[in-house]
């Protein structure tokens, strides 16, 4: 039996419907400010997509573009001004940044309540301590995608391959909050295929095209492919298509986790607006 396709587009649309419903009850319009340095084609495309989606929801969205050689201090000064601007609810600095800019310093400069990417150390701490905050969009999207398709994570053995600060680590924290039993595997994990075969839910986020083969996957497992790798003009995931022969459900690349990342950014922007005004989501 062919694996069920877990469409990120379908799940994202459900998120947008919820956002639109919540917006109708509010007396204000959320505001998002995106900062981009340089003209990297991927960054240009991602920022355009985020801005387009924000505007489609009725958010006040503005993109600020600066030259790639903008000094770090100038960027930090601009972030400080946006932190102080009561008209701005969410701030996003598009990554990656040029080599002369210290990314961690920039991420820590964004006010935690405006940190719609969820990368500020305070939000990271709140994630792991069970508190309320703004959390990274891709991990949020993975969990929301699974919930959309009725996957109950409580007690499930979930293996996450990849330990990045953007996906793997925060996803492990979110899965623990859902009462999953989580294994965080990585490049130094011994006998990785043996570890992945234990998973009832397998999430792969390593940036290595078609790394995971069907022999790595338990019969009937649910597989989420976070990888996006451009190879000879094509977008390939971290999971080989043959995995569909053994998995019960599988996310496509593209069209799986990607749309969910943007949807959760829109959700975080609304949450940021509510947290700043009321201290809780409404």
Curated annotation (Swiss-Prot):
NADP(+) binds at residues 162-164, 187, 228. It catalyses: (6R)-5,10-methylene-5,6,7,8-tetrahydrofolate + NADP(+) = (6R)-5,10-methenyltetrahydrofolate + NADPH; (6R)-5,10-methenyltetrahydrofolate + H2O = (6R)-10-formyltetrahydrofolate + H(+). Keywords: Amino-acid biosynthesis, Histidine biosynthesis, Hydrolase, Methionine biosynthesis, Multifunctional enzyme, NADP, One-carbon metabolism, Oxidoreductase, Purine biosynthesis. Pfam families: THF_DHG_CYH, THF_DHG_CYH_C. Its EC number is 1.5.1.5, 3.5.4.9. The keyword NADP applies. GO terms for cellular component: cytosol. One of its GO terms (biological process) is methionine biosynthetic process. Pathway: One-carbon metabolism; tetrahydrofolate interconversion. One of its GO terms (molecular function) is methenyltetrahydrofolate cyclohydrolase activity. Catalyzes the oxidation of 5,10-methylenetetrahydrofolate to 5,10-methenyltetrahydrofolate and then the hydrolysis of 5,10-methenyltetrahydrofolate to 10-formyltetrahydrofolate. NCBIfam families: PRK14173.1. Homodimer. PANTHER family: C-1-TETRAHYDROFOLATE SYNTHASE, CYTOPLASMIC (PTHR48099:SF5), C-1-TETRAHYDROFOLATE SYNTHASE, CYTOPLASMIC-RELATED (PTHR48099). Belongs to the tetrahydrofolate dehydrogenase/cyclohydrolase family. This is Bifunctional protein FolD. It comes from Thermus thermophilus (strain ATCC BAA-163 / DSM 7039 / HB27).
């Amino acid at each position: 039996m062919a694996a069920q396709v877990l469409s990120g587009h379908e799940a994202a649309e459900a998120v947008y419907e919820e956002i639109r419903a919540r917006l109708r009850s509010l007396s204000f319009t959320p505001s998002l400010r995106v900062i981009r340095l340089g003209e990297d084609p991927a960054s240009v495309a991602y920022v355009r997509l985020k801005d387009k989606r924000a505007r489609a929801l009725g958010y006040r969205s503005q993109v600020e573009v600066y030259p790639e050689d903008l000094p770090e201090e100038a960027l930090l000064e601009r972030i400080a001004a946006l932190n102080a601007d009561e008209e701005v609810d969410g701030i996003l600095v598009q990554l990656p940044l040029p080599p002369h800019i210290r990314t961690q310093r920039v991420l820590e400069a964004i006010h935690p309540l405006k940190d719609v990417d969820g990368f500020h150390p305070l939000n990271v701490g709140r994630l792991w301590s069970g508190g309320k905050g703004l959390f990274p969009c891709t991990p949020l999207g993975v969990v929301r995608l699974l919930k959309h398709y009725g996957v109950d994570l409580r007690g499930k053995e979930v293996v996450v391959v990849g330990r990045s600060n953007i996906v793997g680590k925060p996803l492990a924290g979110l899965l623990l909050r859902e009462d999953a039993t989580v294994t965080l595997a990585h490049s130094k994990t011994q006998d990785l295929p043996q570890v992945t075969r234990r998973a009832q839910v397998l999430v792969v986020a390593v940036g290595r095209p078609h790394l995971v083969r069907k022999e790595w996957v338990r019969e009937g497992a649910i597989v989420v492919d976070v990888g996006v790798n451009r190879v000879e003009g094509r977008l390939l995931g971290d999971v080989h298509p043959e995995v569909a022969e053994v998995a019960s459900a599988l996310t496509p690349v593209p069209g799986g986790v990607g749309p969910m990342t943007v949807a959760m950014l829109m959700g975080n922007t609304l949450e940021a607006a509510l947290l700043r005004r009321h201290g809780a989501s409404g």
